[in-house]
Amino acid sequence: MSTSFENKATNRGVITFTISQDKIKPALDQAFNKIKKDLNAPGFRKGHMPRPVFDQRFGEEVLYEEALNIVLPAAYEGAVAELELDVVAQPKIDVVSMEKCQEWTLTAEVVTKPEVKLGDYKDLTVEVEASKEVTDEEVDAKVERERNNLAELVVKEEAAVEGDTVVIDFVGSVDGVEFDGGKGDNFSLELGSGQFIPGFEEQLVGAKAGDTVEVNVTFPENYQAEDLAGKAAKFVATVHEVKAKEVPELDDELAKDIDEEVETLDELKAKYRKELEASKEAAYDDALEGAAIELAVENAEIVELPEEMVHDEVHRSVNEFMASMQRQGISPDMYFQLTGTSQEDLHKQHEAEADKRVKTNLVIEAIAKAEGFEASDDEIEKEINDLAAEYSMPVEQVRSLLSADMLKHDIVMKKAVEVITSSAKAK
């Protein structure tokens, strides 16, 4: 196989490569074996036409497309490897010549990884907004959240106030006509929770059990149901019960109810302080590391980032997001209807982060190369075992899912990140 590369522009070029007859002939045989089972010709049972007869009647050229599909991937990858190119997007393949008994010649328009000119990435000083300090107010707020989780709803006769829960039947209409989804029975609604559209809950403040309240609201312009968006609506709500939230006393008994490992409220607060300190310490470290990596990327120069790299990352990110939605039972159509957005909107939402991730990965890869990082067999084995433990998977299953090249890449990337973050300091 002969190969050549012609540079057309920054990070773009054309590979010309050939496929020899010793690769083409087996591919033609495979192509014939694949299609012959469906061949039905006079004088032969279906699927039993000999190859010479096929070539005579139809010409082997009929097999070229299928044979090319068979032989092309390895031929293209071989050309890229021989030329030592770092290709980052799907190529555009064109056939130059496919003559009988001769080598085939093809071209591939490719996009290559851009050059990264590194700036400072060690001993960086960065702004960190996160704080390690834990205040008494933060500890008290955590206790209060747990206290509220143990609150009970108690029926009251007085008028509803914000924070109370009302049990209501309601019927909604637009221009006197009821609409789908506008009716509910025995619905528990916490006033001030924002469960309903703006203005609804506020109009139930002051209501008592047995009251019927007319609620007038306007649906938001971006409401998910397009036929209701921006329209004025009237709801008739019948209040069955008003319930107040009754929280337990803030004392040692409450502390024991919250956490059976403590005996007093002071012990609970001390435990929460330690937990918050550990959490804020981790958040601070993450913020410091993130800021250092961001500065290292800002200090570097990426020579003409190919748009294809960002496009591919956007596509990957959107697919991952939609897969997570579907695992929650939300189809793409349902998501777009609920959010009032489109596929194009979703791609735009992911563009900025995708651009940032691509640039970050390029810079970290460049640092790993500059530092000469490699991954030893022992490090690869440790990475496999760590992943198996993290995801509760058999070691051999992890080994089968991840190639050695993928593992090596992850290891050297971690080493490069460590170079940036280990020497970084906060201002």
Swiss-Prot record:
Localization of this protein = Cytoplasm
Q: Keywords of this protein's UniProt record, alphabetized?
A: Cell cycle, Cell division, Chaperone, Cytoplasm, Isomerase, Rotamase
Per its UniProt record, what PROSITE patterns does this chain match?
FKBP_PPIASE
Gene Ontology molecular function: any one: ribosome binding
> Where are the bilayer-spanning segments?
none
Signal sequence interval, chain numbering = none
- Kindly list the biological process annotations in GO that this record carries: 'de novo' cotranslational protein folding; cell division; chaperone-mediated protein folding; protein transport; protein unfolding
Disulphide-bonded residues? none
Q: Which Pfam families match?
A: FKBP_C (PF00254), Trigger_C (PF05698), Trigger_N (PF05697)
User: Which EC number(s) does UniProt give?
Assistant: 5.2.1.8
Question: Which residues belong to any copy of the PPIase FKBP-type domain?
Answer: 163-248
Keyword Ubl conjugation in record: no
The UniProt record lists the keyword Cell cycle:
yes
Q: SUPFAM superfamilies this protein is in?
A: FKBP-like, Triger factor/SurA peptide-binding domain-like, Trigger factor ribosome-binding domain
Reactions it catalyzes? [protein]-peptidylproline (omega=180) = [protein]-peptidylproline (omega=0)
Q: Which GO terms describe its cellular component?
A: cytoplasm
Top-rank lineage group of the source organism: Bacteria
**PANTHER family linked:** TRIGGER FACTOR CHAPERONE AND PEPTIDYL-PROLYL CIS/TRANS ISOMERASE (PTHR30560), TRIGGER FACTOR-LIKE PROTEIN TIG, CHLOROPLASTIC (PTHR30560:SF3)
- Per the entry's comment, what about the domains? Consists of 3 domains; the N-terminus binds the ribosome, the middle domain has PPIase activity, while the C-terminus has intrinsic chaperone activity on its own.
What's this protein's family per the entry?
Belongs to the FKBP-type PPIase family. Tig subfamily.
Q: Tell me, in a sentence or two, what this protein's role is.
A: Involved in protein export. Acts as a chaperone by maintaining the newly synthesized protein in an open conformation. Functions as a peptidyl-prolyl cis-trans isomerase.
Q: In its UniProt entry, what is this protein called?
A: Trigger factor
Gene source species: Streptococcus equi subsp. equi (strain 4047)
